[in-house]
Amino acid sequence: MTDNKKTLVFATANRNKLIEAAGVLGKGFALELPADWGYTNDVPETHFTSRENAIEKAQFVWEMFGKDCFADDTGLEVDVLDGAPGVYSARYAGEPKNPVQNVKKLLRELEGVPFAERTARFRCVIALIERGPEGCEGLPEESEAMAGGEAVPGEGAAMAGGDRGIALPGGGILRVFEGTCEGHIALEPQGELGFGYDPVFIPEGMEKTMAMLTLDEKNAISHRGKAMAMLAAYLGRDEL
């Protein structure tokens, strides 16, 4: 790790996510995991929206270690299933988390649904917490910003409070970014790359599933790639 790199703790135990994030953020960042600081359990996610879960996970790491950090929460939303599996994507088939069984359950529930009606999207919300300047005067407080469950105002936009962010206890500043990827659910799994639902998700305008794309190809169009690119742009990188 070199001094000119910005160090961020990524609030996840999923090293596949870490690899994707590092591929987008580039060499100007050193990414660490909670496990690198001795925390080896899953980071809590107890809410009902991706936005709330991402914020919860980032705050958990911020409060535990006091280090600049970010968290993502990603869900697959299938229109004909009324947005399911959504925030339950990682545990769709129950505990413990089993990506293969999740995919099998999804395909069972879509049995008989024609391809044209299997529209879906991946949604990724990233919450970033950085140590702010002394005082953070003029920023909305966390309680003010969270009241009423105010939505992220747009893809990649900072959450309530605009570019200034939201002041957290302990001197942190919270900002939220969001990316989506539209597509369809395939009739059967295809491809060996990626993880999760990648083998059955065909991005809009493509004929391949995400599991058939290289990491660079995936990052260029994926929900997480878009959200990470917004995060990188905010953090001041010119090269993504």
Segments the model singles out, each with a brief description of its role:
Residues 2-9, 16-240:
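Anionic-ligand binding patches
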